[in-house]
Amino acid sequence: MKYSTIPACLALAAATAALPAFAAGSMPSPIVPDSVTSHSIVLHGNRYGYTARAGLIALRDANDKQTTTMFYTAYTLDGADSRSRPVTFFYNGGPGSATIWLRMGSFGPVRVVVGNAAMTPPAPYKLVDNQYSLLDTSDLVFVDMAASGYGRILPGADAKKIFGSDNDVHAFAQFIERYLKRFNRWQSPKFLFGESYGTPRSAMLVDYLQNNGIGINGVVLQSSILNDGLASTDTYGGASTDDWQYIFALPTEAATAWYFKAVPSAPSSLADYVNQVRTFAMGEYRNDLAQGANLPPAEFDKIVAALHRYTGISETYIRNANLRIDGSRFLAEFRRNQGKTQGAYDGRYWLYTVDRESPTPQLEATDASIDAAYIASQNTYFHDVLKYETPLLYLTGAYQAIQQTGEWNFKHRGELPLNTAADLQEAMTYNPNLRVFSANGYYDSVTPWLATIYTLGHLELEKPLQDHISYGFYPAGHMIYLNPVALAQFHDDLERWYHSTLNVR
């Protein structure tokens, strides 16, 4: 999951810091033997045997000294030819997040059952075979970033050379290369699957790998943020006077209003409605905001009425906000009078409001619903099913380790704000067979879908290469897989995309 929506903090940082048992630390012998177990799963009416491996891969520096370990779980189909069998590497974002969310919620062989747009009931939690797994299409490797999961920075290593956008890419590249070597997967079709900050990681990573002789067949970008300069926050470079953030946020805000039936005479189709709002946002709204203080009063009033109609926010609030309502303010204001605050990761989720006077949310509703279920279920799964034995605690994030080194260095190639669109452009140009799938949730205020399609539509690719980007839009939020209906649609779209990509010659 997880990308920051609150200025001056990293996603989940506050939650992680509140749990002292999750503190970054070292153990005398953090590297333990892999666990290897056998399982089976029924997909599309067919039973498949598969092998699950949980373990660590140690990274080394230029002097061949071990610096850190990265934890992973890999699921490989029994009896398949590894020379032709695809392999997909999954990772979450943060930066700092472990890959618990994708591992336990998306396309692996098991899935945690959580509340869909509702609070998950308390323990015991339910873990089921995942009928939406992609294991019949690809082998699956879920990778936790350095110093998260069961991975640790090893004694004597310089953490500042491990954290940061460029260092992080080098770590993932080395992990992938060592995995390919260890399991002789060099001939396998290779895919990258990143969520949230995992999407700029993917853009940098695919470019880096290909420029170092490791070809990639396809990249899945779920809930993208390739250009921080277009983000709906001023934390990493988008100035608060930059109107793009309000334009990109509007269709997402409208989707949440549609979901809660706050839109009079709205179309029954969510897709039709948000595309109607998109046309307004990129047209009349964009043009009027560009006029700034020169916008005529009559036109100002017209936009006030339109924003009220699309979002359900009061005209008084819209006037006071000077027509500009970013995602955080919308989430706090939308049902303020009911004492409710919407979730940034998924606007369908809500919590009772802590402070009705606060301009932005104090708590994240999506986290409140799912975090305990995911953490408990994964720990049980590792112990009872994968039989992975270690003295270490599983770290849901590397945030404390990062904080001990200062801050995450977002500079990429010496530049800020972080903008990895050029990396993806270069990767798609260098490898004209590369295919990209962009997955987006309509209710995601963290990485608004309109910002994503704007970014991907401005890579300045030649048209034949631009056509290699496919899109999926789903009735869900940042973590598309939280909605089983959206997960089923996402699975089917990806299955078709994989098959199409694997037929590229």
Question: Residue spans of the language-model regions?
Answer:
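Gram-negative bacterial Sec-dependent N-terminal signal peptides
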Residues: 1-22
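N-terminal cap/lid subdomain of alpha/beta-hydrolase-fold enzymes
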Residues: 24, 64-161, 457
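A catalytic-pocket lid/entrance helix-loop region that shapes and gates access to the active site
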Residues: 109-113, 207-312
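Alpha/beta-hydrolase active-site loop
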Residues: 134-138, 145, 162-180
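Alpha/beta-hydrolase fold nucleophile elbow
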Residues: 184-196
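Glycine-rich nucleophile elbow surrounding the catalytic serine of serine-hydrolase chemistry
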Residues: 193-207
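Alpha/beta-hydrolase fold catalytic core
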Residues: 291-446
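Catalytic histidine-centered segment of alpha/beta-hydrolase-like enzymes
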Residues: 475-486
